[in-house]
């Protein structure tokens, strides 16, 4: 049981040899993670973390935007269990498909995951979750609407910590953007985005 939220979590305790293999995998994927993870992601990434995320939120609220701004706090429902090995492998094949040996190695490592989804508590799964999450965030940031021939971004800013993220913008645009992102992430990645209007 989680001490803060009192949620029951299925934590995975990996064997030492699995942990070593996962460290090798993360090292091998460094270039991919450097290219794909966004600067707005703060969870389980060295040099970032909660304090850096908090400072980013403060900068957004104090300096970046003048006038009124609406904020939606969102999270991914059952985040790690929602990310299947199949989903991760499809994205990896798309991005590093030419590296057959690395694809084989990652597939073999993830065969050990119970339930065929990412495990809470593993080193590689935390990086892979951020990798999958970057697709959701990138999709949200790409949304725009055209009015009188002028394109405007529907989402002004995002700050993400693991599966929790805050989205900044104007209420009407955020409503549309989150509906689109919820549909897209469910159909494409199998993730269920839960917005909580505050």
Predicted regions, residues:
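Short, conserved non-catalytic motifs in the polymerase core
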Residues: 1-20, 36-49, 109-131
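Generic structural motif
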Residues: 2-3, 16, 32, 77-79, ...
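Conserved polymerase palm-domain catalytic core
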Residues: 59-196
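Hydrophobic side chains in beta-strands
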Residues: 1-2, 27, 167
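Active-site-proximal segment of RNA-dependent polymerases
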Residues: 22, 26-84
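Surface-exposed beta-strand edges and their flanking turn/coil or helix-capping segments
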Residues: 12-13, 24-27, 86-87, 180-182
